[in-house]
Regions:
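Short glycine-/polar-rich loops that comprise or flank the Walker A/P-loop
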Residues: 27-31, 103-105, 131-135, 145, ...
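Short regulatory helix/loop adjacent to the ATP-binding pocket of P-loop NTPases
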Residues: 119-128, 144-151
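Structural recognition of the conserved hydrophobic beta-strand(s) that form the central parallel beta-sheet
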Residues: 107-111, 124, 135-142
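Conserved catalytic/switch belt of AAA+ P-loop NTPases
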Residues: 97, 122-136
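Clamp-loader machinery-focused feature within the broader ASCE/P-loop NTPase space
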Residues: 1-119
Length: 151
C-alpha cells in the first residue's frame, strides 16, 4: 500500500523518506483506511472502526502480527464478540466516494472480513466487484477461516 503512494519508489520498494511514506509509517495517511472487527460501545448506538482507530494504530506499531484475542485485549473488550457492523459499510462507501486527498490511490484495508455481518457484506458486494477508479481493497482474512472457505 505504501509503495502505491510513494513519491519516489524504486523498482523493489517505497523510498521510506517522502512525506507520503512517513505518513504511511505513522498509519496516518489520509488515503489509507482501516476496517476491522469492533465491539459496540455502550455510549454509542453505532460503533465503527474509526471509534477504535487509536488502539488499532498502537497495536500495529507494537506488532504487525496479532490475532483477534490480542485485538480484543487492546480494545479492552476481552470475552466479547467483535464484528464488522452494517454501519461500517456506510462509512466505507462514504470514504471511497471522496476524492483522494493526495491525488493517488485510496486504500481500504479490511482485517478479518469474515467478521462482517451479512447486511454489511451485502451492501459492499457491488463496491468490491466494481471499485471506483484508483481504489484498492486489501482483505486480510485469518488463515483458518480462509482455509475453511477453500474446502
Amino acid at each position: 500500500a505504501r509503495y502505491l503512494s510513494c513519491q519516489n519508489p524504486n523498482d523493489e520498494d517505497a523510498c521510506g523518506k517522502c512525506p507520503n511514506c512517513v505518513k504511511f509509517d505513522k498509519l496516518a495517511h489520509p488515503d489509507l483506511h482501516f476496517v476491522f472487527p469492533v465491539v459496540k460501545k455502550k455510549s454509542s448506538k453505532e460503533t465503527v472502526s474509526d471509534d477504535y482507530l487509536p488502539e488499532w494504530r498502537e497495536l500495529l506499531k507494537e506488532t504487525p502480527y496479532f490475532n483477534l484475542p490480542m485485538w480484543l485485549q487492546a480494545m479492552g473488550t476481552e470475552n466479547q464478540q467483535a464484528l464488522i457492523y452494517v454501519k461500517e459499510s456506510d462509512e466505507i462507501i462514504r470514504k471511497l466516494s471522496l476524492k483522494s486527498s493526495q491525488g493517488g490511490y485510496k486504500i481500504m484495508i479490511i482485517w478479518m472480513p469474515e467478521k462482517m455481518n451479512t447486511e454489511c457484506s451485502n451492501k459492499l458486494l457491488k463496491l468490491l466487484e466494481e471499485p471506483p477508479a484508483q481504489t484498492l481493497f486489501l482483505l486480510n482474512a485469518m488463515y483458518i477461516a480462509a482455509k475453511k472457505m477453500m474446502k
